[in-house]
Amino acid sequence: MKKSSGKVVRYNKWGYIFLIPFIVVYVIFQLIPLISTIYNSFFENYMSGLTQVGPNFVGLANYKKLFSDGDIWIYTKNTMLLWIMCFIPQIILSLVLGAWFSDVCLRLKGTRFFKTVVYLPNLIMASAFSMLFFTLFSDGGPINSMLMQIGFIDTPYKFLSNAGSARGLIALMNCLMWFGNTTILLMAGMMGIDTSLFEAAEVDGATSSQVFWQITLPLLRPILVYVVITSLIGGLQLFDVPQILTNGTGDPMRSTMTLIMFLNKHLYSKNYGMAGALSVVLFIITGILSLVVFKITGNDKRKG
């Protein structure tokens, strides 16, 4: 028994050795920056012209200023609105395509090709997508030219000067970039469902809609929860598309300014105290959402 125990210890030693590179990278690039961010959030540290103010310890003053300032609530509303405008069509489209291409009864050909094509937008850089949409929807772009030629409008419509259309473009771009990833996840979940359940439902005379709502959707619950929460976390971190499309201004009338763009403004102006406080708030929100995912998926496993 002692010899066997010694062998187990020796084998486990290699597991710990292989973990060392990950631990080192995590400490350098994750843990130390996190501690530094929390530390800086309690200090007044910014540039006033060419003069460096601080660092001076101010306690929770940065957090109080952050929440007393009305800007954070405006940008939180913008961030959540952009996420909702993107996620609702994204999840509907992904569910429809996933159910369509994973349905054994339809026996559609070319599903492998479809899986590749639908994921391609996810590989395109946000900067390239933004420049493409900026060109397409500019005043002299092809979309305005086409609408004027068919007589739908008389003068070029300023898509980026209207809050609704600007938000719509950002939501559309994010939907196109990420719906492929969601579709693949849902398709994998649907294809993992036991086909005998569908066969039994067919024998009982269930319609396609009844099968989808009563069998497919309930069994997809863990994956749907994962998709919703990860999408929400991604929505909180929305930055690249509106930053490039509006050149960091969040126009028109700050309607496309997100929380991460707000954070970037503080970092660009070297207001490290406020940037640290905002980062900590976002970190706490992300941590709470991650805990929700863990609890829900854990409950599903225990029920299973």
Where are these regions (language model features)?
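N-terminal leader/signal peptides at the extreme start of proteins
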Residues: 1-4
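A structural signal for multi-pass alpha-helical bundles of membrane permease subunits
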Residues: 7-304
